[in-house]
Amino acid sequence: MITKSEALDFLKSDSINSILKKLTKINAQTSSKHITFSKNAFIPVCNWCRNVCGYCTFRNENFKLLKMNEMNEILTKADTFGCREALFTFGENVDENEKVKEELKKMGYSGILEYLYEISAWCLDNTDLLPHTNCGILSYDELKYLREVNASMGLMLENSSARLCGTIAHEKSPGKDPKLRIEMIENAGKLKIPFTTGILIGIGETLEERIDSIFEIKRIHENYGHIQEVIVQNFRVKPGIPMENYKEPSPVEMFKMIILSKLILEDISIQVPPNLNRETGQLFLMAGIDDWGGVSPLTKDFVNPEAPWPDIDELNIFSKELGFNLKERLPVYEKYITKEWLDKKILEKIEK
């Protein structure tokens, strides 16, 4: 087990030998030569958000709320493409926006979660896709409600440091308070919801804060056992964002954080988004990643629209060059496909 002090020394070191030693340890501990991915459809239910993050282009004051028939059409088409994950995403607390609320009311819904529940249920009844929801902070009761129609759910921790709430990254984003995010991730554990979380590298955090964030995820998982994967995501500059002059993390920074994440989190899958790391993603296989995350043959990444998904054939070539077999997975990892972790309806659908 690596300590926080050892982790910090590693991040500060410029020694190639220290990297090679840890890579040797990871290789010795890793028996599988598979790297997984989920073939998905990205459904941006609504692109308004109460948070105004310094690195985000998803939020739009002139929001679009997808209509039910629009989502039905995307899901039906995704089914023909062989997609098995429906990624439902919208901004946090969109009900705070009176215009969004009014649109939902006109369609006969009391709020966005009722709307989401209905489209998720439709997805389960009419396609072979399984819903995965990522929509910001949710309460215990809201998580419990959505558990009935989700195979898994997600929320990026991003960073466990409250200091970042006073920086350009999160000063206008009340939902990025790490206490709120940790509480939700823990509530998901209490409810036995298979969960995806992660850290965001390069938004002004210190090396110590990166390490603390990974150890916080480890602490939560040790208590509840529900974190199926952790995303190590790199900040990318986008034109027009408040942080457009910030420096992106270097490949070495990412390489080291992936190594540490693998060693600290042990049995949790480590994911790096391939569309944000086209030039370096292949190298990160050597650092310990074992999942490429969601990749869509149909829809773009609406959070990072400037970064197209690689073709699945391209991912296969990337993986095989380092001896890895590309393996498709569901949005819920295999070890969580039990009655303990899934609603009866979801479990029956998977087993069928």
UniProtKB/Swiss-Prot annotation:
Pfam families: Radical_SAM. [4Fe-4S] cluster binds at C49, C53, C56. InterPro entries: Aldolase_TIM (IPR013785), CofG_family (IPR019939), Elp3/MiaA/NifB-like_rSAM (IPR006638), F420 (IPR034405), rSAM (IPR007197). Pathway: Cofactor biosynthesis; coenzyme F0 biosynthesis. Its EC number is 4.3.1.32. One of its GO terms (molecular function) is 7,8-didemethyl-8-hydroxy-5-deazariboflavin synthase activity. Binds 1 [4Fe-4S] cluster. The cluster is coordinated with 3 cysteines and an exchangeable S-adenosyl-L-methionine. Keywords: 4Fe-4S, Iron, Iron-sulfur, Lyase, Metal-binding, S-adenosyl-L-methionine. Its cofactor is [4Fe-4S] cluster. It is an enzyme of class 4 (lyase). Residues 35-275 form the Radical SAM core domain. The keyword S-adenosyl-L-methionine applies. It catalyses: 5-amino-5-(4-hydroxybenzyl)-6-(D-ribitylimino)-5,6-dihydrouracil + S-adenosyl-L-methionine = 7,8-didemethyl-8-hydroxy-5-deazariboflavin + 5'-deoxyadenosine + L-methionine + NH4(+) + H(+). Catalyzes the radical-mediated synthesis of 7,8-didemethyl-8-hydroxy-5-deazariboflavin from 5-amino-5-(4-hydroxybenzyl)-6-(D-ribitylimino)-5,6-dihydrouracil. Consists of two subunits, CofG and CofH. Belongs to the radical SAM superfamily. CofG family. PANTHER family: 7,8-DIDEMETHYL-8-HYDROXY-5-DEAZARIBOFLAVIN SYNTHASE, FO SYNTHASE (COFH). This is 7,8-didemethyl-8-hydroxy-5-deazariboflavin synthase. It comes from Methanococcus maripaludis (strain C7 / ATCC BAA-1331). The gene is cofG.
